[in-house]
Amino acid sequence: MLQAKAPPVTRNDYQEMPEGPPYFQVIEGELVMSPSPKMFHQDIVANLCHLLRQYLEKNPVGVVCVAPLDVFLSDVNVFQPDVIFVSSARRSILTEHGIEGAPDLVVEILSPGTVRYDKGSKRKIYARTGVKELWIVDPELKSIQVYHLTRNAETPAATHDASVVFKSALLPGLKIKTAAIFKSSLRK
């Protein structure tokens, strides 16, 4: 017996939900629950945010935000990227309810529950909706894949391991020691 396909979840449906936790995203009209991240994941978020804010204090070219914060990319795509950068030129997309449109830079930190979305459909949607640069951070491999989405959404422009200093084409003068991103507050 055929079952009727449920209608897509829209931005309006999403906004009527109670505030989290648990946290959800809408990916191509599908409601997807985001499990709570692990401690190392949160260390990476904090480290990246700290490094980006240090850069922005000296180079006030935009604002950095962290999850949970809604990014409304379309009526059926509402994401909560781990770290977000919006340039000063595009500051008008920042609202009380989240971000209305594509940020300039999105950072997704992989976790077992999100890897297929982060590396698959979300990457493609980011490219389609105008995100310029995407960093996919892999805590297991301690590596960062950098995508220049306006040029090539399928192949990373670079992959950096924990031994390098990397730069962003989007943020002139930014130099990040990759190892600094992977500092953990847990003793090993």
Roles of regions detected by a PLM:
Residues 1-188:
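Gly/Pro/Ser/Thr-rich low-complexity, intrinsically disordered segments predominantly at protein N-termini
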